[in-house]
Amino acid sequence: MRGPRLALGVAGTACLLLLAPLAGASNSSPYADGAADAPAAAPDLTAVHVSNDDAGNVSFRISIPNRVALAYTDLVSLFVDADGKTGTGCARGAFGAEYALDVLSDRYVFGRCVRGSWDFTRRPASFGGSFAGSTLTLTANRRDLGGASRLHFRIGAASATGADPAYDFAPDIGTSPWSFEVIAPPQAVMKPPAWLRKACRQHRRRCRLTRR
């Protein structure tokens, strides 16, 4: 019985090492864009605060002080470059975004760049958005943002009130994108291998499985 017991002990230890939470891994960073640096009709992007929790959920809090609510003509798009390469994703050569977190008035959508075009048909469960106190909050788990530990991002806002929409961008066009490092335990990105999940299901007292 030594062999099975030893194998079970190794599996149990591996479960705990892989799946047990690591405290204090959350992270946050502030960013700033100039106030009133765009046409008055545009949603004015100013302070941006990005954070993540230990589960790898990344939240973008975007201050728009000239809006108490988003108008039906307002569009805000947050573009994420997950691989840091301008030659991949959409808008190649300029930014290369793989993901887009968008809001049009009160409709929140999640986009993936598929073969150079945006696909907004599949919304991940981790994605969500809200607007309150002149602050737009967009959230998604980094697993749904390519699983990268460093995310490069840009934000664009527009108000389509006529033939000539008003825009604001953060950071400004012609400057480098902002970058955020996600600090979270490995299990926030990695799913345990099949054999380990099976061992943990059979011996729950020795393992703590996190549902995915």
Where are these regions (language model features)?
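Acidic, glycine-rich flexible loop segments
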Residues: 113-145
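Bacterial N-terminal signal peptides that target proteins for export
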Residues: 1-11
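Short, well-ordered strand-loop elements centered on a beta-strand within folded domains, enriched
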Residues: 89, 106-117, 152-155
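Hydrophobic residues embedded in beta-strands of well-ordered beta-sheets
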Residues: 56-58, 106-109, 134-136, 207
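Acidic/polar low-complexity flexible segments
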Residues: 82-98, 144-201, 205-212
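Bacterial N-terminal signal peptides
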Residues: 9-21
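Extracellular structured ligand-interaction cores
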Residues: 55-57, 73-77, 98, 124-128, ...
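Surface-exposed, glycine/proline- and aromatic-rich loop segments on solvent-exposed faces
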Residues: 26-107, 160-167
